[in-house]
UniProtKB/Swiss-Prot annotation:
Keywords: Disulfide bond, Hormone, Secreted, Signal. One of its GO terms (molecular function) is hormone activity. The gene is RALFL16. The keyword Disulfide bond applies. It is found in: Secreted. This is Protein RALF-like 16. Belongs to the plant rapid alkalinization factor (RALF) family. InterPro entries: RALF (IPR008801).
């Protein structure tokens, strides 16, 4: 009599497993191709897409020093005079 009570449970379990294998096992594994991925891609920089090229920042011209800092840009302003004694080296005087 014990086997008679367990048989509906075993039958129900076997039926549920069969239904589960039919629904879950029938699906195919799908892969994504390059066509579906390529739609969201930013076009590469080149002669076909020049607008997508990122422009490099340029180095703007900047003088090394300004006239007010006296960087010897104005050579007429400075004079050189050499004082040579017998034992001394030449001395440059800037006026």
């Amino acid at each position: 009599m014990v086997a008679y009570e367990k048989s509906p449970i075993v039958f129900l379990f076997a039926t549920m497993m069969l239904v589960m294998f039919l629904f879950c096992g029938s699906g195919e594994a799908r892969t994504l191709g390059y066509g579906s991925i390529k739609g969201d891609r930013i076009p590469a920089c080149g002669y076909k897409n020049p607008n997508s090229c990122v422009k490099q920042p340029v180095n703007h011209y900047h003088r090394g020093c300004e006239k007010i800092t006296r960087c010897a840009r104005d050579a007429a302003r400075y004079t050189e005079s050499f004082n040579v004694d017998d034992d001394e080296s030449p001395i440059i005087n800037l006026h």
